[in-house]
Amino acid sequence: MDLVLDWWGSNTAHFADVGCGSGCLGLALLNKLPEGSSCTAIDISEAAVSLSTRNAENLGLSSVYDASRRSASELDGAFDFIVSNPPYIPSRDLQGLDAEVVDFEDPRALDGGADGLVVARQLLDRAPLVLRGGRRSVWLELDETGPALLSRSYACESFVDLAGKERFARVDF
């Protein structure tokens, strides 16, 4: 989140949160961005959409947070930037996950396909159609192989997490 805020600055923004889950990323950004900012959040899970909507209400942000059930390829609107924590675990690695992850997460929120980038690529294919302005970027949280794989196909900058692993990517259009 701090990477996005440092990059964006103190301007108002209308942004999208793709794969919003509980809404933590989009709502945290709304709390830090100036008044007048807004977020369109989407997720394929109706339970996630309901949870993120309740969280927005609890934080007093429901007037600037709009969540709906849609996939990354169905994102529409015009956004200053997009943030996403898509499913990024390669399918072959799902069996090795800890029980506390598997038992409490919707499997669709975890399985990123063969290389962990299926949903990220769907979003990146859609992004040029919905990004506006001069700073047309998508911010992604991925597994540590994701940024390097993305850089083969996209103009991409990677960033390290608190453990020093490359887990964040900004893809510019």
Regions found by a protein language model. Give the residues of each.
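Conserved SAM/SAH cofactor-binding pocket of Class I
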Residues: 1-96
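Class I S-adenosylmethionine-dependent transferase superfamily signal
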Residues: 29, 101, 123-127
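Helix-to-beta-strand junctions that scaffold the AdoMet/dcAdoMet cofactor pocket
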Residues: 34, 105, 131-134
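Acidic-residue sensor for enzyme active/binding pockets
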Residues: 46, 100, 105, 141-144
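C-terminal beta-strand of the catalytic ATP-binding
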Residues: 88, 172-173
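Mobile active-site "lid"/loop adjacent to the S-adenosyl-L-methionine
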Residues: 88-119
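Conserved Class I SAM-dependent methyltransferase catalytic core
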Residues: 114-171
